Structure formats: C-alpha cells, structure tokens
C-alpha cells in the first residue's frame, strides 16, 4: 500500500486506541468541576476519563467527556430553573499545540516541546472549544423536579443546550486542568557531525489526525517532523496519510523519498567506487505524470566514475560509469547505469545495466537491525558499440590479428562494430559487479537502524518509558518502518 509524508521529512504515526491507553495510564482528567457566577448560571459535577473519539480531521481532535451527577441552576433569557442529569457524554472538538516542556530541561543540548490541548484562542472563527450537540446516553435527566423517564423531547433538548453552555464556559476557563501531554519531542539544538543518522533528529514539529473507518484502532495521530535543522513552511500540510502505518504493524514511521535518497543512499553509493571523489552524485526532483514529482539520485551531468583498468588485446583501458541513476518506483527502487570503455581502435564498447531492489529488515554481524536490499529478478545488460573515429576496418582487423591471433572475417552490415564487440567483451567482467554493489554495500556496512530509531522515534515519546519494537521495513513511496509501540504505565 502506497503512502506519503505530504512533504514532511519524517512522520510518526500511532493508532488512537494506543494514545487513549496512554491517557488512561496518566489519569489527567480533573475529577470534579464547579462553575460559579456563569453567564447562564451555575453548575457542578464530576468527570470520568476523557478519551479521543472519531470525528476529527487534520488538526481537529474530538474528545468524549463523560459527566456524572450534573447539577445546574440555569438563569437564561427564556429559561430559568434547576436541573441536571445522572450521566451523559459530552463531545467537544479541540486543537492541540506544541508548548515548551515544563520543567525546562537543564541539558543545554535539549529543547523539549510537549503536545497538549490548546486552551486559548484569540480567533473567534477558530475557538479553543466547540461543543458537538448530542443527547445520546443522557440518563436521569430532570428540570424543576420534573424527572423525564422517557425519551428526551425538543423542550428537553433546549434545556440541555443551556447545560452545554454552562459546561463549555467552565471548560473555556479551566481546560488547562486537563494537563495531559500527548507526546514530547526533543528538538535537538546540538547534533554531532560524526553521529550516524544525525539527520533524523527533529528540528520542527507539528501534529495531525486521520480518521479511518470510524475505527479508533485504525485512526491515527501523527507527529510530523522536519529534520536536520530544516523548518516547516506552507509546503507542509497539517495532515497525515491514512496509510502511514503498515498493514502488518501497529505503528509506523515514514522517511520521505528526499531524505531516503539524500541521507541514506547518497552517502553509501560513492563509497563502493574507490576512484570516486564523493561529489559526483546529486538528488533531483523531476516532474512526473499527473503533476507529481519524483526524486532521483543521479550522476551529475559531465561527471564520470572510473572503474578498475582492464586489458583488451594488449591495451590497458579504463572503463568508466558514464550515467547512473537510482529511481524510487512505488515499492521498489531501480538502478540504471551506463558503463563505457574507449578503446584505442577508434571505437567504444558500452554496457547498459538495469536492476531493481526491495528493502527489507535484516541484522548485521553485531546483531543490530539494519536496512538491507533484496534484488528483484535478474539484472538486464545491453551491450553495444560506437565508432568514435574514422578508422578503416582493415586497420582494426590487423590489430585483431596481431593481438588475438585469429582472422576475423568481414560480416556485411556489421563491420568494425562486430570487431569491437569481441574486444569489448572484456568489459562485461568489470561492470558485472554493478548490479551487486548495493547488496555488497548492504547489511554489515550500513548503519544500524537502531541509531535511526534512537535519533528519531525515541526523540518522540508518547509516555515516559516508551518502547518501539521494529518489525517491518519496505518502500511504499517513502521508506516505511513498522513496529509495535509499547506504552508502559509509569
């Protein structure tokens, strides 16, 4: 299943039922509430545990607030009296906000921010609290000693609206009492340049909610991050893709295509070629069908990478990679390369290679989890020749006779290209290693994915002693990691 980070560097997605489980562990809900001198009277009652429910989207989060033993003295323009109910569920819509962690960390290398309910708003079109009217689950409703034993009437709903106004007024004054931290993110001020996976550390953060099938075990709350010192902009939407979590995992972590190519693949490719200077490659964002963009890691225009010398008919030649690109194609990546050798006969032999890979989870010799590459099918090789100088076939044939010790008969329509194909056959041995270089530079040389989790996932805590157990890695547009988040009771 394909997914997207929606232009964020990384996305950490957790199902809502796990978030609610963490809320229960902390018991942040105030037990009692009382409003005095309200605009529409007075009220009091008790709360049970608040929980996230279905109905939100993007930055909007809906909460269910169970209320017990509610009593009110209503003073309204069209209604006055005393009433209440034994129990009811109030639904509200709120937004969250990242705020500086309290108490402030004494570690100068940390900048902790907490995701909490936004308690204030100066924008009338974007209030801190929106009441979602409902009369479901109302039990023991009464007003002016008139107890309703049957279904609530329209008049009863009118009275309930006054009750809602009173509760909303208390919430607007006291919402900060629900002092729950949904998660804490460490926006690291200091990052060691020698540290592997350092680029995964968050430097800017936001959140988003995505509802899936009105199912809290599928709906997700996500932490959206820019990393390695980058900040957010209008290109980053406050949304999370509903497919951010792999089907086989409980929680998910995404690394964008741009970061995957620039920070995972780009540093590894030059190391495979001893004669590479390390600056020959770049990541470009090229347009694709439907107005979308795709990231490609490619050899820069005008650059080449020399390979080991070969001996062809007594001549020492240096084959070189003329073109190379790595493309992300949905759930796999494709490596395409063009390798060339220019022979002193006025002709060149060229080999085009294409191979494809999937990502998988593996372990290195140290027992650390790491990202590995698995080849799909067999590489394809296309070999051909080009005449680069105006050299007669008789001269080439003479060289072949002198160096190879056999007579090459002229084949009409092929000429010197047939001759150079024999010489260029030596090239195949050199470039045959190219389809395997990703696999060779694989498990034991790639940095441990544990370090990625340490610098990314572990910098985002949903409770004070989270454990994220990784069990899945694949390409799904971005690089998708899946695992199980264990939120422990502390």
From Swiss-Prot:
<dbReference type="Pfam" id="PF06597">
    <property type="entry name" value="Clostridium_P47"/>
</dbReference>
<comment type="similarity">
    <text>Belongs to the TULIP P47 family.</text>
</comment>
<keyword id="KW-0843">Virulence</keyword>
<dbReference type="InterPro" id="IPR010567">
    <property type="entry name" value="Clostridium_P47"/>
</dbReference>
<protein>
    <recommendedName>
        <fullName>Protein OrfX3</fullName>
    </recommendedName>
</protein>
<comment type="function">
    <text>Part of a botulinum neurotoxin type A2 (BoNT) locus; may be part of a progenitor toxin complex required to protect BoNT during its passage through the host gastrointestinal tract.</text>
</comment>
<comment type="subunit">
    <text>Part of a crude toxin extract that includes BoNTA2/NTNH, P47, OrfX2 and OrfX3; OrfX1 was not detected.</text>
</comment>
């Amino acid at each position: 299943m394909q997914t997207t980070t929606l232009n964020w560097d990384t996305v950490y997605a957790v199902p809502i039922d796990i978030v609610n489980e963490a809320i229960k562990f902390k018991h942040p809900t105030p037990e009692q509430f009382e409003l005095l001198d309200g605009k529409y009277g007075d009220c009091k009652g008790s709360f049970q545990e608040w929980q996230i429910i279905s109905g939100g989207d993007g930055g909007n989060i809906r909460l269910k607030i169970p209320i017990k033993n509610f009593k009110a003295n209503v003073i309204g323009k069209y209604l006055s009296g005393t009433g209440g109910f034994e129990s009811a569920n109030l639904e509200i819509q709120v937004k969250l906000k990242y705020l500086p962690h309290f108490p402030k960390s004494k570690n100068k290398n940390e900048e902790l921010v907490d995701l909490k309910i936004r308690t204030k708003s100066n924008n009338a079109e974007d209030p801190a609290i929106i009441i979602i009217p409902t009369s479901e689950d109302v039990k023991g409703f009464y007003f002016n000693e008139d107890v309703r034993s049957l279904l609530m009437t329209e008049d009863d709903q009118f009275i309930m609206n006054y009750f809602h106004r009173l509760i909303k007024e208390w919430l607007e004054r006291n919402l900060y009492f629900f002092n729950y931290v949904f998660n804490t993110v460490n926006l690291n001020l200091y990052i060691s340049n020698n540290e592997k996976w350092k680029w995964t550390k968050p430097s800017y953060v936001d959140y988003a909610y995505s509802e899936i099938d009105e199912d809290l075990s599928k709906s997700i709350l996500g932490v959206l991050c820019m990393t390695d010192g980058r900040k957010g902009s209008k290109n980053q939407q406050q949304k999370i893709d509903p497919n951010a979590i792999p089907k086989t995992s409980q929680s998910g972590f995404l690394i964008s295509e741009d970061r995957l190519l620039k920070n995972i693949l780009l540093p590894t490719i030059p190391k495979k070629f001893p004669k590479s200077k390390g600056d020959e490659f770049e990541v470009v964002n090229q347009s694709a069908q439907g107005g979308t963009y795709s990231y490609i890691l490619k050899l820069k225009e005008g650059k080449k990478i020399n390979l080991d010398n070969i001996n062809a008919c007594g001549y020492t030649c240096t084959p070189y990679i003329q073109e190379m690109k790595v493309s992300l194609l949905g759930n796999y990546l494709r490596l395409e390369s063009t390798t060339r050798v220019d022979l002193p006969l006025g002709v060149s032999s060229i080999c085009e290679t294409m191979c494809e890979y999937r990502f998988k989870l593996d372990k290195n010799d140290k027992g650390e989890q790491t990202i590995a590459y698995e080849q799909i099918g067999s590489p394809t090789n296309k070999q051909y020749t080009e005449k680069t100088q105006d050299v007669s076939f008789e001269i080439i044939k003479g060289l072949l006779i002198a160096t190879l010790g056999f007579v090459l008969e002229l084949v009409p329509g092929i000429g010197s290209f047939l001759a150079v194909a024999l010489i260029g056959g030596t090239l195949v041995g050199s470039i045959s290693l190219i389809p395997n270089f990703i696999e060779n530079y694989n498990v034991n040389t790639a940095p441990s994915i544990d370090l990625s989790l340490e610098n990314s996932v572990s910098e985002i805590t949903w409770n004070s002693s989270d454990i994220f157990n990784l069990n899945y890695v694949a390409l799904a547009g971005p690089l998708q990691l899946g695992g199980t988040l264990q939120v422990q009771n502390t």
